């Protein structure tokens, strides 16, 4: 006995439950993700122990990274692959977030130093106008000390002497910024 086309549907089980969504991932995408995790592992290998302390790593991963930092040549590559494999089985987001914070803090510090250098240059070139701006930014700054350092820096610049006072101004501004 042959079934009619409309009877074929009777053999299909009713699936009233929600169908599980199957997400198809290409092999190339899996490889790209694995390569990205290896790069993350390489970035972690470049960090010092103080920086690694600030990143949430479990003991196995931490010891694998420390071992990779000691290994040279071909063994290092294999260890990097192991670190990538270990990262695939862990949640990478907290690690990436902590790593980005470390990088961002360094960038912020560099930007602050550039700002302080420009402020120092303005102090030496413009004198009292720039001193007023510095005092507005940092009310706890000592006007007399700052003006004395500026005068010394201007004398050194005019006499082609080493910029000792110039560096002192920068150090003073840095102390004010960190306070």
Curated annotation (Swiss-Prot):
> One Pfam family from the UniProt entry?
DarP
Give an example GO biological process: assembly of large subunit precursor of preribosome
**Major location, coarse class?**
cytoplasm
* Repeat recorded as keyword: no
Q: Which GO terms describe its molecular function?
A: ribosome binding; rRNA binding
Where are its TM segments located?
A: none
| Compartmental location | Cytoplasm
> Which residues are connected by disulfide bridges in this protein?
none
Enumerate the NCBIfam families for this protein: PRK05255.1-1
What's its job?
A: Member of a network of 50S ribosomal subunit biogenesis factors which assembles along the 30S-50S interface, preventing incorrect 23S rRNA structures from forming. Promotes peptidyl transferase center (PTC) maturation.
Name it: Dual-action ribosomal maturation protein DarP
Please name the source species. Answer: Erwinia tasmaniensis (strain DSM 17950 / CFBP 7177 / CIP 109463 / NCPPB 4357 / Et1/99)
């Amino acid at each position: 006995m042959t079934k009619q086309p409309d009877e074929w549907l009777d053999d299909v089980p009713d699936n009233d439950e929600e169908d599980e969504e199957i997400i198809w991932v290409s092999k190339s995408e899996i490889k790209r993700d694995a390569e990205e995790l290896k790069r993350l592992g390489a970035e972690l290998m470049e960090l010092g122990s103080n920086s690694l302390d600030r990143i949430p790593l479990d003991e196995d991963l931490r010891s694998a990274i420390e071992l990779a930092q000691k290994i040279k040549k071909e063994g290092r590559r294999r260890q990097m692959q192991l670190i990538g494999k270990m990262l695939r089985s862990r949640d990478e987001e907290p690690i990436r977030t902590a790593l980005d914070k470390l990088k961002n803090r360094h960038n912020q510090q560099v930007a602050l130093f550039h700002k302080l250098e420009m402020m120092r240059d303005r102090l030496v070139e413009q004198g009292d106008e720039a001193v007023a701006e510095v005092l507005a930014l940092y009310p706890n700054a000592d006007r007399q000390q700052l003006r004395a350092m500026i005068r010394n820096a201007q004398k050194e610049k005019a006499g082609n002497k080493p910029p000792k006072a110039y560096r002192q101004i920068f150090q003073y501004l840095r102390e004010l910024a960190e306070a």
